[in-house]
A protein has these predicted regions:
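Insoluble glucan recognition modules
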Residues: 1-219
Length: 219
């Protein structure tokens, strides 16, 4: 390499977001594409309404995760409309297709319910983990991972709990493999413990949209 070679003026990206770089070394051109921060999940469960669909949040470049209520066919999209990239059925389990004629994704074998989705748009793969239990371990119950919350719509989960001990978290499927914690208005994936003054509360976990939240209503 010639140390005196002119490499041009360095470019600057001023936006904090995932970016996809495409470089053509033959003609020395490049493209920079901003990656979406969320994926949408239009389908039967929300009347194919983008505004009502759950969103999956980007956690690495091209990787998205989050909760979604599924009761029938659906798709993943990177825009709140059909004008972006739509991810449909490739015909192979766990593999997506961006072909315009790709069919809808099917309801998993576990049936209607809450699922935790993990989507990789880099290699067009995805997983759906069925949520069979929403748990609330904490100081008030000796961090019992099997204490369950209840729901009537799969997206709002409640329990009346005597929160003595100050800290608790939300866990899933009677396991610590998946948990959320942190601030009441911004729960984080495997985040820190939630904190509450001692008292008896109606605890409500809201998984309708991101960020996920919880409320405490004194009883």
């Amino acid at each position: 390499i010639n140390d005196t070679q002119d490499y041009g003026t360095p470019g600057v990206i001023t936006e904090d977001a995932g970016m996809l770089f495409k470089v053509n070394m033959l003609d020395l051109t490049y493209e920079i594409e901003k990656l979406p921060s969320v994926l949408y999940t239009p389908g039967n469960s929300n009347g194919w309404n983008f505004d009502n669909s759950q969103q999956l949040v980007s956690y690495e470049t091209g990787k998205y995760r989050g909760f979604v209520y599924i009761n029938g066919i659906f798709k993943f999209t990177d825009a709140p409309n059909w004008n972006g990239t739509n991810y449909g059925n490739s015909g192979t389990d766990g593999v997506l297709s961006t072909d315009g004629g790709a069919g809808n994704l099917e309801l998993p074998a576990q049936g209607e319910g809450l699922y935790f989705a993990d989507v990789n748009t880099n290699d067009l793969t995805y997983t759906l983990t069925y949520i069979s239990a929403v748990n609330i371990p904490g100081g008030f119950n000796g961090w019992d991972i099997n204490t369950k919350m209840t729901s009537t719509d799969y997206l709002h989960w409640t329990i009346v709990a005597d929160l003595q001990g100050g800290e608790f978290k939300f866990a899933f499927n009677n396991s610590w493999d998946l948990s959320y914690g942190g601030a009441a208005d911004d729960l984080l994936y495997n985040g820190p413990n939630c904190k509450a003054p001692d008292g008896t509360y109606l605890v409500t976990l809201d998984l309708t949209s991101v960020p996920y939240t919880y409320t405490l209503t004194a009883q």
